[in-house]
Swiss-Prot record:
Record Pfam families: PAN2_N (PF20770), RNase_T (PF00929), UCH_1 (PF13423)
Entry's localization field: Cytoplasm
Enzyme Commission code: 3.1.13.4
Domain of life: Eukaryota
GO molecular function annotations of the record: metal ion binding; nucleic acid binding; poly(A)-specific ribonuclease activity
CDD domains in the record: PAN2_exo
Name of this chain's protein: PAN2-PAN3 deadenylation complex catalytic subunit pan2
Binding site for a divalent metal cation: D868, E870, D977, D1036
Native species: Aspergillus fumigatus (strain ATCC MYA-4609 / CBS 101355 / FGSC A1100 / Af293) (Neosartorya fumigata)
Catalytic activities: Exonucleolytic cleavage of poly(A) to 5'-AMP
InterPro entries: Exonuclease_RNaseT/DNA_pol3, PAN2, PAN2-PAN3_catalytic_subunit, PAN2_N, PAN2_UCH_dom, Papain-like_cys_pep_sf, RNaseH-like_sf, RNaseH_sf
Uppermost EC category: hydrolase
Family: Belongs to the peptidase C19 family. PAN2 subfamily.
Activation and inhibition: Positively regulated by the regulatory subunit pan3.
């Protein structure tokens, strides 16, 4: 007990009914899984309290009133177990009942404890029967007879059980026989605790007058030698005792009058005394962390003691689930003036009149070939148009068949854009349930006819972009987009993400100290985290694929998309699989070179014997492998079904214990000879990744056999030999308990789809998503991942390969024991040092625009930060202009992150930047868009830049750390910024002022420039006299932060609707742009009034009017602002990513209605 320990909280025990009086707690206990304190009362009700403030969390009637009081509470990972005299009950921590057990021989239960098996407990009491209960099944599995009445149980080296006569029995944990018994106290034992090898008891004895009184000694026993140790003197009367969970020889001893003593059992003279403010103590308990102590008294109160600076109940607690806030339905403004298009129209499902049949559509000529985007950076102006070096991708006099390009893709019925839905319903209406992509595609055929076609979901899918960007789509599952170079790896990335052990490895590595710019394992961690946070929105693997493209080895091996013209997709993805696994291993060892965690998970540990067939000389070298290729025997298809050598398990065994013959150099013969190479396996990995390696049509016949690919295989390694089993043979070996047998289950596979009907080959993945689910699922659920189209499929369909257009490429098996092994502990070990130190590529030049965070400012969940980013153009958008003049975005513009500014959103330094990084870009920059981004040539070059220049990996990791620390990002138009950064932020961590200041009756988003003027009468983002200046991201982020604070003031005052009405009324007059500085302008004051601004002062911010007088202000004299399109806000009408509201107050400015 440290010097600053004191009473932190005191709460009354909740009454048994809403109008009842508080009652005494019959038992209290700290939860060893979550930050909860549990208490039970005499009416059979158990209640939990959250955190140091002891907030009410759950309250459940666990036992009928007739069963008596709650006498003990135990904790399991799956729930909470309570005991009353006549029943045992288990609930989840949210209060849902798991099971309830009562028995005719359960008459006076007092205690319970875990046994040697962690899924079983034993319950006992003042009765002649003890019961063993299986927690998982909720049933009694055994009944034991006993000659003792037990009142208390504690588990340590033995099961220590106190009797009602003052004795303590040490019971065996396996058969519960009495190993040793001590007469500890004369009358009864009041409390005891056992931990490690020590047992301490407190109790009563009879003195002179014949009535029992509390013993002034706490008895101590050594469970290792089963002998008593010197007792602990405690003159106030030792009534209660608890052993410290961390300090093995330290115990807390308490009296009934509230005196607390912390004593070392090995040194009784070293004591620490405290006095609790209680009239009569009924019990104590100490938290698993040792940092909190709970006291239960006779005045119906619970006291919490601890250190105010560092109290917590557990070292590693699971997050406590709280109830969702139920949104209130928005009021419907129904009046004669309400336009009917506010009500919305239903979605169509039948065929539209505009869908003309194919026999009425005729070709009228081929469109010109589109310009290769790779030529754009090299274009040079000429007298007419531009010119560039010829890339020589076609032969001489060869032209491109552009008609084939337009008709190669099937006519797929795409789902509705969200922007189309926005015309039918307002933002504040709850989004109606719409069919997912698979349902939207169902019923269409490749030729456009409305008939069912099972091949449609396997077809090539291409995103049709709207002018609002890709966030304008509405899909029910998170897929990966296809418009990025090397996106043919999407199927493999999805497969790796759904392997729990690979997913855990990547996320833990991403949370480490790694800041290597080309770390593929980090990028996988970022992508997997993004896919989990997306909740059905599309994601893109831009950063990962950019890193993959930067590897010279990948280019030399022909693994990039530009090199696949002469290589099949199947062989290419298998080569990429080997490259990914090797690079993952390399990246992992760069941070933890001495750890074998990756080898344990992914690597087949083996030795390779090479023997010369001429001289029989043999050498042995390591032969570890990360990916195994299947080797097929010479196949007689007639015997394939009956011959065991053609079973998958046999082929797998031969592939792992690969034995080959070829020519090699013999050091003994000093010449090339015929050598035999054979592998001896020492250990199999937890994750087994296989390349199918289908080299000919004969091997493919095996796969076409129904049920040939098993869902489960068993592998046993014995003295370097591998044994593989499947089907009934595997079940037999499991029943016989074959040593070292490990069962693997199929997580998923990557397949090549080659439908010959005017389609190009592409890759899909079939994944059993139940394996990676956090909650146990009895049924396997298989899904087809076809880039951004995700569809649930039947298991037989996923594992059937008797179609000529479907070929297996990569298989992934994982040990069955790792099912649902989704580990989120990486969030608790995030390495945040990058946020607290400077990092620069250009020699650490002084940065005056920011002030680095201190340790005292470490972000916590809910910490607001203001964000703004700037981008440069790497590629222009590809737009197809149709014959009727309409435009369709074929491929969006490609932007590169150039600057990131993050400001503190609260505290003493509110509004002060702590991140202001410029990002170096190695790709050719088409346009710096200086007028809008403020980025000038040379700003991103380490040799000439005067700013803090960092790699993209460092800037991205800072934002990723803030995201996973729980920060709330405040900004304007964040949806566009997040997409270009390639990061997924949940709605609960986003405050977008573009959606805060949105009127439900106006289909318009307001620019930050206009909002700054409308709310604060300030001019930002003005047209500079020098076009080489442009925007300032710090200014934009600070303005967004101030707008949020001001909006909170409007909410507190209840005038949000009036303010929005006034803002939109004035905006419609001014074209939603700030008025020119010269001239008279009418600005907002309060609802229903106006203020006239005169030109006089020349300041950015107009003068603040007096609070009590007429609201007047002055504006500056300047050149009028030229209307222009905000480049960085080009998707101002993108669907909302959500809003965040919370307590806070901003400054009061002139014209505020709060005045």
């Amino acid at each position: 007990m440290e010097a600053d320990w004191d009473e932190l909280s005191r709460i009354p025990v909740p009454p048994p009914s809403p109008h009842g009086l508080p009652t005494v707690a019959t038992t209290i206990a700290f939860d060893d899984v979550s930050e909860l304190l549990w208490a039970g009362n005499e009416f059979g009700r158990i209640t939990s309290f959250y955190g140091p403030e002891l907030q009410r969390y759950t309250s459940v009637r666990a036992h009928p009133v007739s069963d008596g009081p709650v006498r003990q509470i135990l904790f399991h990972e799956r729930g909470v177990i309570s005991l009353s005299p006549k029943s045992v009950h288990m609930i989840t921590r949210r209060g849902l009942t798991q099971w309830h057990i009562s028995h005719e021989e359960m008459t006076d239960l007092y205690c319970m404890s875990f046994t040697a098996q962690l899924n079983k407990i034993i319950v006992a009491g003042c009765q002649r029967a003890m019961f063993t209960i299986d927690i998982d099944k909720g049933i009694i599995v055994d009944k034991l007879h006993t000659d003792h009445n037990y009142t208390m149980m504690k588990k340590s080296r033995y099961l220590c059980a106190a009797t009602d006569t003052g004795s303590v029995n040490a019971l065996s944990l396996t058969d519960f026989r009495v190993v040793k018994s001590w007469k500890s106290h004369g009358t009864a034992i009041n409390d005891m605790d056992a931990r490690n090898d020590l047992l301490v008891t407190c109790g009563f004895s009879v003195r002179h007058l014949g009535s029992p009184i509390v013993d002034p000694l706490a008895n101590v026993y050594d469970l290792k030698t089963l002998s008593p140790l010197p007792p602990i003197p405690f003159h106030a009367g030792a009534a209660y005792v608890r052993m410290h969970p961390k300090l093995s020889t330290t115990s807390f001893v308490a009296s009934q009058t509230g005196q607390l003593q912390v004593v070392d059992l090995m040194n009784p003279n070293a004591i620490n005394l405290r006095q609790a403010n209680v009239s009569f103590m009924l019990g104590i308990d100490i938290s698993p962390s040792g940092e909190a102590l709970a006291i239960n008294d006779a005045e119906c109160s619970i006291h919490l003691w601890g250190s105010p600076s560092k109290i917590h109940f557990n070292e590693m607690s699971k997050e406590v689930e709280f109830a969702d806030v139920v949104p209130r339905p928005p009021p419907l403004d129904w009046s004669p003036d309400t336009p009917l298009n506010m009500i919305g129209m239903p979605y169509y499902r039948e065929r539209l009149l505009s869908a003309w049949p194919s026999h009425l559509v005729f070709e009228v000529g081929s469109p010109p070939a589109p310009i290769d985007q790779s030529l754009i950076p090299y274009l040079r102006p000429a007298e007419m148009g531009h010119y560039a070096p010829n890339p020589k991708k076609t032969r001489r006099y060869q032209v491109e068949n552009t008609r084939a390009l337009t008709t190669a893709e099937p006519a797929l019925i795409a789902p509705k854009f969200l922007s189309e839905k926005a015309r039918e319903q307002s933002k504040f209406k709850s989004e109606a349930s719409v069919s997912d992509t698979a349902e939207a595609l169902a019923g269409a055929k490749l030729n456009g006819e409305a008939e069912d076609d099972p091949l449609l979901k396997y077809s090539n899918v291409e995103i049709k972009y709207s002018r609002f960007g890709v966030d304008d789509f509405d899909f029910s599952f998170s897929g990966l987009e296809t418009h990025i170079a090397n996106s043919f790896t999407n199927a493999l990335l999805q497969l790796l993400k759904f392997i729990p052990l690979v997913r855990n490895l990547a996320l833990h590595h991403a949370a480490s100290t790694c800041i290597y710019e080309t770390c593929l394992l980090c990028e996988m961690g970022y992508l997997f985290d993004m896919l989990e946070k997306a909740n059905g929105q599309n994601c893109q693997a831009t950063n990962l694929l950019k890193t993959f493209s930067s590897y010279r080895e990948a280019s030399n091996l022909g693994l990039l998309e530009e090199n696949l013209t002469t290589k099949s997709l199947s062989s290419a993805i298998q080569s990429v699989n080997r490259f990914f696994l090797n690079q993952i291993a390399h990246d992992f060892r760069m941070i933890v070179p001495s750890s074998d965690d990756l080898d344990h998970r992914l690597s087949t540990i083996a030795s390779e014997s090479i023997r010369c067939m001429f001289c029989q000389n043999e050498i042995v070298r390591p032969g570890n492998s990360l990916a195994n290729e299947l080797i097929y025997p010479t196949i007689d298809i007639k015997q394939a079904r009956r011959n065991p050598a053609f079973r998958f398990s046999s082929i797998l065994r031969a592939s792992i214990e690969r034995e080959t013959q070829n020519r090699g150099w013999c050091n003994y013969c000093r010449r090339y000879q015929q050598v035999t190479i054979r592998k001896s396996i020492h250990r199999m990995p937890l994750v087994l990744i296989l390349n199918a390696a289908l080299s000919n049509a004969i091997c493919r016949r095996l796969w076409s056999i129904p049920g040939w690919l098993p869902e489960e295989v068993g592998i046993a390694v014995d003295n370097g030999q591998v044994m593989c089993f499947e089907g009934d043979e595997l079940k037999t070996q499991l029943q016989n308990k074959l040593p070292n047998l490990v069962v693997y289950e199929l997580v998923g596979l990557v397949s090549e789809i080659d439908i010959p009907e005017h389609q190009k080959p592409h890759l899909v993945s079939f994944i059993n998503v139940s394996i990676s689910s956090r909650e146990p699922e009895a049924k396997n659920r298989w899904h087809l991942f076809n880039d951004f189209l995700v569809t649930e499929v039947d298991k037989d369909e996923a594992l059937r390969f008797n179609q000529p257009w479907k070929s297996p490429c990569i298989l992934a098996y994982q040990v069955k024991d790792a099912r649902h092994a989704v580990d989120d502990s990486w969030k608790n070990v995030l390495d945040t040092t990058l946020l607290f130190r400077d990092w620069s590529l250009n020699g650490g030049r002084a940065v005056e625009t920011r002030q680095t965070l201190t340790e005292e400012e470490k972000p916590t969940p809910g910490t607001p930060v203001a964000l703004d980013t700037e981008f440069v153009d790497l590629e222009k958008a590809e737009i197809d202009v149709k014959a009727d003049g309409s435009q369709e975005i074929v491929r969006p513009s490609k932007s590169g992150l150039a600057r990131v500014s993050v400001l503190r959103g609260s505290g003493v330094h509110e509004g002060v930047p702590f991140i202001d990084d410029y990002i170096t870009i190695k790709e050719p920059i088409v346009d710096y868009v200086t007028q809008y981004s403020g980025i000038k040539p040379g700003d991103l070059d380490p040799r000439t830049s005067q700013h803090n220049l960092v790699p993209l990996k460092v800037a991205y990791k800072k934002l990723w750390l803030l995201l996973n620390l729980g920060c709330v990002f405040v900004g304007h138009g964040l949806a566009s910024d997040f997409r270009k950064i390639n990061i997924q932020v949940p709605k609960s961590q986003t405050v977008d002022t573009q959606y805060l200041y949105f009127h439900p009756g106006k289909n318009r988003r307001l620019s930050l420039r206009y909002l700054a003027w409308a709310v604060f009468k300030e001019y930002i983002q003005e047209e500079p006299a020098d076009n080489n200046q442009g925007h300032d991201s710090i200014e934009d982020a600070r303005m967004a932060l101030r707008l949020w604070k001001k909006f909170q003031e409007y909410e507190d005052a209840g005038i949000v609707n009036q303010i929005l009405e006034e803002i939109f009324r004035e905006g419609s007059k001014l074209g939603f742009r700030p008025p020119p500085r010269n001239g008279v302008a009418t600005v907002l004051s309060r609802p229903g009034t106006a203020v006239t601004m005169q030109n006089s002062s020349g300041r950015n911010t107009p003068s603040t009017p007096d609070v009590g007088g007429a609201a007047t202000a002055t504006a500056t004299t300047s050149a009028p602002a030229t209307p222009r399109q905000a480049f960085r806000r080009s998707i101002a009408l993108t669907p909302s990513n959500g809003t965040f509201s919370g307590p806070g107050a901003g400054d009061f400015f002139g014209g505020s209605p709060l005045k």
